[in-house]
């Protein structure tokens, strides 16, 4: 995921649960987030403004950069949790007290998986470090057992792998080396949970049962699947040509929400041609929601958006009547991504964020009282993406 325009599209389109985020221009971090090897701990973040260290790599005082916007009426007491580099896709555990997130900073060539407390303290890396044979990673979630599930390429060798071939235009690579892994709470004893001959990633978890939903192209198309927390009972959930990905369960696990492309004609031919090269062109994605049947398949699928733009990172409110998603539909140039809220039937849409750069990857806490999201706001260095926590106000 990368988080800035025009790289913002990379953010919705990098291998991730939700989508891409803008790319950072620098990786200076203040304060530095400790890795699992240092066993150190960061202090909790301070509401509304960044910590009193006041400089994030380019000398601008924290007070000069806006974290809380007066016209974002649903967000109060906005708190910055990370400071510098690329930090995105922060997801709550079932208790609402911990988060996993993707982090790229301090000169790293690709994202690593971190875990931290919901106040921003105790940041540490839980995916293998490059020094220990780590690879490219994406999309992590905490199971009810406290184990961490994520996708990684490190089973096929260390390193970040090559970037996608830009001669094909703006494309995102669905690395066939991605497999789904599970590890202990601090990243210990990682093992493969699901592996096919192709791309297996974007795993998220039902907080009630631990069932996992993910994306795979093992049948030749990018489809949604689900499985038990131990890797058993794998079921294919979608069967329509196009990229189905970035799926999440609702809090009660009765619904699944995701983003998908539905190309036809020449666009379908282009999609299938690129997929044979492990590439996806992610400029047109819509939001879908479906009920989860007793046999764990999907039923009563509804298309929520139909605007032909890049829509991604959907997440259900715990009341199951509303959802959040991220879109560039408000910017004629397609570079500014904001968070929107809409009813499940597509009515009553409202813009939630107004920051004139990137806001994305929203997730409600299990009780619906908090919202965690990623943003380019309050940047210490141009291109930084950080994680923010806010009180949600209806």
Stretches found by the model and what they are:
Residues 51-76, 178:
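Blade/loop signatures of beta-propeller domains
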Residues 83-86, 103-113, 129-137, 151-179, ...:
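A flexible loop/linker signature enriched in serine peptidases of the S9 family
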Residues 94-95, 143-145, 207-208, 251-252, ...:
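Residue-level detector of Asp-centered blade-edge/turn motifs that repeat once per structural unit
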């Amino acid at each position: 995921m990368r988080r800035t325009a025009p790289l913002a599209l990379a953010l919705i389109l990098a291998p991730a649960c939700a989508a891409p985020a803008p790319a950072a221009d620098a990786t200076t971090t203040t304060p530095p987030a400790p890795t699992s090897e240092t066993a150190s701990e960061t202090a909790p973040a301070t509401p509304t403004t960044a910590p009193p260290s006041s400089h994030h790599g380019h000398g601008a005082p924290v007070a000069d950069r806006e974290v809380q916007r007066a016209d974002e009426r649903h967000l109060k007491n906005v708190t910055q949790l990370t400071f510098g580099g690329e930090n995105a896709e922060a997801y709550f555990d079932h208790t609402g007290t911990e988060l996993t997130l993707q982090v790229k900073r301090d000169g790293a060539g690709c994202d690593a998986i971190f875990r931290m407390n919901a106040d921003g303290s105790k940041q540490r890396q839980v995916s293998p470090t490059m020094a220990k044979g780590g690879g490219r990673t994406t999309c992590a979630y905490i199971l009810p057992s406290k184990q961490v599930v994520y996708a990684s390429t490190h089973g096929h060798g260390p390193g970040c792998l090559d970037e996608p071939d830009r001669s094909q235009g703006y494309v995102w690579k669905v690395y066939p080396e991605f497999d789904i892994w599970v590890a202990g709470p601090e990243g210990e004893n990682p093992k493969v949970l699901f592996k096919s001959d192709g791309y297996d990633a974007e795993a998220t978890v039902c907080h009630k049962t631990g069932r996992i939903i993910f994306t795979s192209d093992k049948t030749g198309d990018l489809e949604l699947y689900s499985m038990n927390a131990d890797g058993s009972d794998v079921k294919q959930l979608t069967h329509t040509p196009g990229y189905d990905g970035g799926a999440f369960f609702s809090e009660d696990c009765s619904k699944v929400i995701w983003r998908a492309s539905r190309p036809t004609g020449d666009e379908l031919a282009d999609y299938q041609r690129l997929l044979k090269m492990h590439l996806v062109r992610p400029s047109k994605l819509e939001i879908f929601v479906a009920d989860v049947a007793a046999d764990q398949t999907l039923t009563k699928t509804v298309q929520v958006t139909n605007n032909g733009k890049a829509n991604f990172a959907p997440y259900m409110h715990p009341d199951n009547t509303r959802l959040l998603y991220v879109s560039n539909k408000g910017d004629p140039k397609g570079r500014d991504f904001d968070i929107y809220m809409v009813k499940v039937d597509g009515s009553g849409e409202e813009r939630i964020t107004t920051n004139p750069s990137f806001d994305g990857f929203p997730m409600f806490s299990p009780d619906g009282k908090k919202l965690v999201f990623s943003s380019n706001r309050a940047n210490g260095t141009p291109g930084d993406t950080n994680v923010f926590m806010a009180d949600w106000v209806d």
